[in-house]
Each structure stands twice: as structure tokens, then as C-alpha cells.
Amino acid sequence: MERIMFRAKIHRATVTQADLDYVGSVTIDQDLLDAADILVNERVDIYNITNGNRLSTYALSGPRGSGVIGINGAAAHLVQPGDLVIIAAYGNFSEEEARTLEPRVVLVDAQNRILDLQPA
């Protein structure tokens, strides 16, 4: 049996932009994607700490060192610049893999610079 497990998150990121007219997705600073081991086009869930909204979308790469967290498309109705969010990724793992999984947690400051990397 495979289990769907939490494997990575970017915790308490600040949304820097929202573009209702863009065709879906979330744009994330490539440094943050690398730190969280989230790939371009990978499905991610976004949990809005500010207002409680939740949504699923896919990740796009933003410029390295920019701190960009850009909510694109219809999701811009649910998340606004300045909101705090958690961006989480999940994966399918065998029973054995699931029991030894150590998720990556990327903690960031108000400018979305990496403060710490830790297991969940």
C-alpha cells in the first residue's frame, strides 16, 4: 500500500504579488523551491494563515534571491499581497518509505529569506 505523506513546506512565507489575469499557479523564488525540494510544475497546497483559505495549484520558478511568492490566476481571489501562507508538498510513499520520511521545512523571514531548514 502507498500512503500520501507530507514531504516539504515553506512556512509563513509572505505573499509579494497576486495576478488575477495570469494563467494559474504560484511563482516561488527558485532558492526557496530548491531548499524545499519542490520542482517546477509540482502540485502544491497553499494554506493562507491570514484568512484561512486553502487551495491547490502548481509551482513555477521565480528569480533567485527575489523572495517572490506570487499567487496567479483565480487563486488571487483567495490570497492577497501581504498574506502569510504555508506552501506544502505531498508525495506517494511505500509503507517502508513513509515510516522513515523526514520532511523538509523551510522557515523564512518577512522578506522570504531562508532562516532555517529543519525536519518537520
Swiss-Prot record:
Amino-acid positions noted as binding substrate in the UniProt annotation, renumbered to this chain: T57, G73, A74, A75
Intracellular or extracellular location(s): Cytoplasm
Pyruvic acid (Ser) carried by residues: S25
Keyword terms: Autocatalytic cleavage, Cytoplasm, Decarboxylase, Lyase, Pantothenate biosynthesis, Pyruvate, Schiff base, Zymogen
UniProt main location, coarse: cytoplasm
Top-level EC class: lyase
Residues of the active site: S25 (schiff-base intermediate with substrate), Y58 (proton donor)
PTMs per UniProt: Is synthesized initially as an inactive proenzyme, which is activated by self-cleavage at a specific serine bond to produce a beta-subunit with a hydroxyl group at its C-terminus and an alpha-subunit with a pyruvoyl group at its N-terminus.
Quaternary organization: Heterooctamer of four alpha and four beta subunits.
NCBIfam families, A to Z: panD
Function: Catalyzes the pyruvoyl-dependent decarboxylation of aspartate to produce beta-alanine.
Full protein name: Aspartate 1-decarboxylase
The organism of origin for this protein: Deinococcus geothermalis (strain DSM 11300 / CIP 105573 / AG-3a)
Gene name for this UniProt entry: panD
